[in-house]
């Protein structure tokens, strides 16, 4: 599994349309608030042309992409942090994800009602972010109350945690995002168990009309907000993506050519999510299967091996490693080996994105 990204937004911004296109799950996207109550989950393959290039050389029995999970979380509304509009359940569902894809409506359409009567991305973002911040404020205050007693008793870990929580508190009181705070890795680790919603990596998915990718003041608003808090923006037209998702490969390529698109916008959403979580891919390439594996950036060779099986990590000896570029240039493992491009990497090797690896282990 790659990662779990929760898709959030106000009702009627195009969340379920986007989710349907992402997963081809075909859940009902009714023009009505709260048509999604239980979160719908879809597992989506990670688009990576490198996998096909490797398969062309190796000719395996099958190819397996890495995947990620998208969760369509029901439309949040003002007051969700106090339980309005089924809010408590929604917030719990978001808490269980690793990242947030916040869909924002950046198009006019009289046939699709807007919950507040007008299209205003800045207001929409503020409503959602305020609800998330209020939920986090409640979590933070409870944690401070709980940790204070231990800290007074001289508990070092409790003191460290309390210091971080007291840094977070004023930010949340002002409905600010914790991800905009400059927290160190140690500080984040101290409060990780609390699963703060506003600390989760977030991308804004700007849902635009077919002609709304340029000269769109709504889109500009979203970009401005994202820049201030260090988030990314991915513009897509959910309606077009839904059409593309229904086509077979040949029709899809033709349709995208007509629209002047190089690839479905959803590929950008998936890749942005991947990057957001600091993930990368390595490959295994054998005649039985060519496969992509997800690891965090900075993972060592044994940690990468452990993704396949824990025994590979426990008994790790070394990793026969070829860069993706060399594997393609020299037409596979044998050619790369003959050209002196296969390396034997040890326990301290930091895996690079695209490495083609074969692990030697002994248990």
Swiss-Prot record:
One of its GO terms (molecular function) is metal ion binding. Residues 3-256 form the OBG-type G domain. This is Ribosome-binding ATPase YchF. GO terms for cellular component: cytoplasm. ATP binds at residues 12-17. SUPFAM superfamilies: P-loop containing nucleoside triphosphate hydrolases, TGS-like. Belongs to the TRAFAC class OBG-HflX-like GTPase superfamily. OBG GTPase family. YchF/OLA1 subfamily. Its cofactor is Mg(2+). Keywords: ATP-binding, Magnesium, Metal-binding, Nucleotide-binding. InterPro entries: ATPase_YchF/OLA1, Beta-grasp_dom_sf, G_OBG, GTP-bd, P-loop_NTPase, TGS, TGS-like, TGS-like_dom_sf. ATPase activity is stimulated by potassium and other monovalent cations. Stimulation is maximal in the presence of K(+), followed by NH(4)(+), Rb(+), Na(+) and Cs(+). ATPase that binds to both the 70S ribosome and the 50S ribosomal subunit in a nucleotide-independent manner. Does not hydrolyze GTP. It comes from Escherichia coli (strain K12). Monomer. The keyword ATP-binding applies. Residues 278-361 form the TGS domain. Mg(2+) binds at residues 16, 36. GO terms for biological process: response to oxidative stress.
């Amino acid at each position: 599994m790659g990662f779990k990204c929760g898709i959030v937004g106000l009702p009627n911004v195009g969340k379920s349309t986007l989710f349907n296109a992402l997963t081809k799950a075909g859940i009902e996207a009714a023009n009505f608030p709260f048509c999604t109550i239980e979160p719908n989950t879809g597992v989506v393959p990670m688009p990576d042309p490198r996998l096909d290039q490797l398969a062309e050389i190796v000719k395996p029995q099958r190819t397996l992409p890495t995947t990620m999970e998208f969760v369509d979380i029901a439309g949040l509304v003002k007051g969700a942090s106090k339980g309005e509009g089924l809010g408590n359940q929604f917030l719990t569902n978001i808490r269980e994800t690793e990242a947030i894809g916040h869909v924002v409506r950046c198009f006019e359409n009289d046939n699709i009602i807007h919950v507040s009567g007008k299209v205003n991305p800045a207001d929409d973002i503020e409503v959602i972010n305020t609800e998330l911040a209020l939920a986090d404020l409640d979590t933070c205050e409870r944690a401070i109350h709980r940790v204070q007693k231990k800290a007074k008793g001289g508990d070092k870990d409790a003191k460290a945690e309390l210091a971080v929580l007291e840094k977070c508190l004023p930010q949340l009181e002002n409905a600010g995002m914790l991800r905009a705070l400059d927290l160190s890795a140690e500080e984040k680790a101290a409060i990780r168990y609390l699963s703060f919603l506003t600390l989760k990596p977030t991308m804004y998915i700007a849902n635009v009309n077919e002609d709304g990718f340029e000269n769109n003041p709504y889109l500009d608003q979203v970009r401005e907000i994202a820049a201030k808090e260090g988030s990314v923006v991915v513009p897509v037209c959910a309606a077009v993506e839904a059409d593309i998702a229904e086509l077979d490969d040949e029709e899809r390529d033709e349709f995208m050519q007509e629209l002047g698109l190089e690839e479905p916008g959803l590929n950008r959403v998936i890749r942005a999510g991947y990057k957001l979580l600091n993930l990368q891919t390595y490959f295994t390439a054998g005649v039985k299967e060519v496969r992509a594996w997800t690891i965090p950036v900075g993972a060592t060779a044994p940690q990468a091996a452990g993704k396949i099986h824990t025994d590979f990590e426990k008994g790790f000896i070394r990793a026969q490693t070829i860069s993706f570029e060399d594997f393609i240039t020299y037409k596979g493992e044998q050619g790369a080996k003959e050209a002196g491009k296969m390396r034997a990497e040890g326990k301290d090797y930091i895996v690079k994105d695209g490495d083609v690896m074969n692990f030697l282990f002994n248990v």
